[in-house]
Amino acid sequence: MINRVLIRLKIVQIVYAYYQNGGKNLDTAEKELFFSLSKAYDLYNYLLLLMVEVTKQANKRLNAAKNKLVPTKEELFPNTKFVENRFIAQLEVNKQLLEFSNNQKKTWENEADFVKTLCDKILESDIYKEYMASETSSYEEDRELWRKLYKNIIFNNIELDQVLEDQSLYWNDDKEIVDTFVLKAIKRFDEKNGAKQELLPEFKDEEDQDFARRLFRRTILNADYYRHLISENTKNWDLDRVAFMDVVIMQIALAEILSFPNIPVSVSLNEYVEIAKLYSTPKSGGFINGTLDGIVNSLKKENKLTKN
């Protein structure tokens, strides 16, 4: 699940913090990097559990209405299509998700007010109403309902962002990327797999894990060389006056460009320009792009960089 976009973001955060804290312990910082990445995977599982919790909340409401002193006919014989959603039933018994919940002791029980509010939004939505009014019923429709609900109601949800931020500082910048993986997980679900449906693994393969470790270490261990290159290509600037975050981003970008021959230069440049837009000043993207482009051209002229 953890892809290189997320890895780059985390390395920028950890390298910046490493220098702010005096740059003393590389091993400790590396452990912090991988702990931070593991927290992103926890968030992925936690957001999958949220869909189950909302369904449970809807079911509680149906049962409460049935047990009223004088329930209406509709309350006695409600439409149970939503609470009997086959995709959610499969997700609820998923072995990997149950293992996460049991091991991490993570549930939504302490966020009951938020779950109720989210349930209200879902039950009031046109997506829900169209689904409930449909006379057809299939696993595919059940799964598609939750893809739509997640994309339109959970994906950009300010209240949820606040809940997650209060629970873990590691999740501040993760949700937007993790949301895309939750949507992928929903699409991947197949009824015939039952409780054994595989969720996305934490790392796709060892290569991505190695990428994280190597990029982080090269960034720190070769810092003097990378900063020399930056200084040489910003002669009209006092490097001490360049935003420190810009220096960190360029340092990591150079580590990637010079250490990973299979990653095209254009890919690295684009990725770090986008990161600059998130973490630095409004003009940082253009400044970083221009500086790195100048460094790349100089290295190519000196035959110190041969890839495109």
Regions found by a protein language model. Give the residues of each.
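Class I Rossmann-like S-adenosyl-L-methionine
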Residues: 1-308
